[in-house]
Amino acid sequence: MSPIVKLLAQRIALSLLLLLLISVVIFAGTIVLPGDVAQSILGQSATPEALANLRAELGVNDPPVQRYFAWLFGAMQGDLGTALTSGQDIAQALSSRFWNTLFLAFWAAVVAVPLAIFLGLLAVRFKDRWPDKLISAVTLASISIPEFLIGYVLMYFIAVKLRWFPSVAMVNDNMGLFEKLNAIALPIAVLTLVVLAHMMRMTRAAILNVMQSAYIETAELKGLNAFQVIYRHAFPNAIAPIVNVVMLNLAYLVVGVVVIEVVFVYPGMGQYLVDHVSKRDVPVVQACGLIFAAVYIGLNMIADIVAILSNPRLRHPK
């Protein structure tokens, strides 16, 4: 087996092991929650016999290990269980909401990634001058403010005062693309501000590191202007760390939209999760947690693979 194949196999195996461990944490965390699931479903007036029958039906009395493996094997086959509060199949209920979350994350990435790279290039071009300092200050301020606060501030000024975009990001299948984009404009703006600083600063740092190379000095001696040196010579050789940090932020965009979906009442997985946490709907919480973990770990694994394939130094064991 070649070193690169072995390294890729190790990354994939570690990701699967991590997902398995997180599934244990998710399951254990939900079963130790206080309260009685049967009582919350049937209400305070339920008889002891009715409560006992429902507990037996839900498998609450089964050993935790048996319940865990039944849940895990079901999830591996696409069976995420049934919502306790509505009786609806969880996989079916999550299908449209999952795509809504991906839709929001995708368009946030479409805006954030090119903007972060452009600002990073601009900061390098004007290193230690006022554009560089201004970009760094604004992006650091955006990452320092809680995202829900940014959401409410934008909602107040842009949606309520200026009435440019709706304050509630409601989308449905009957809406056209531009209608949906208009509806999610504010959530996209908030998510962009949240992830912009990390990607911009990584772009800046990666390019500045490459600018110390000898071939950059050679390019400057050829008479190329500063922008040509940065864009044509430094930027292509700094792609690997930039792609890595972009993938990590894409993972955050998918998993970290929970707060934004709640703020803007967006019909995604985050909103669905919060609604059912308040109802103590354990199967829904477990399913959403497992999906979020799988997406996050999967995108991080892709980031590792891209870093390995794009950097020859990582292809060989140390």
Report the location of each language-model feature.
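An internal, D/E-rich "acidic patch" concept
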Residues: 1, 61-117
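Alpha-helical transmembrane segments of integral membrane proteins
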Residues: 2-8, 95-131, 147, 176-318
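N-terminal signal-anchor/signal peptide hydrophobic helix marking the start
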Residues: 9-15, 19
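Hydrophobic alpha-helical transmembrane segments of membrane transport/permease proteins
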Residues: 18-69, 162-183
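Hydrophobic alpha-helical transmembrane segments of multi-pass integral membrane proteins
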Residues: 20-24, 64, 106-110, 153-154, ...
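Membrane-water interface segments at the C-terminal ends of transmembrane alpha-helices
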Residues: 25-32, 62, 70-73, 137-168, ...
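Membrane-interfacial helix-loop-helix junctions in multi-pass membrane proteins
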Residues: 56-65, 80-90, 171-184, 191, ...
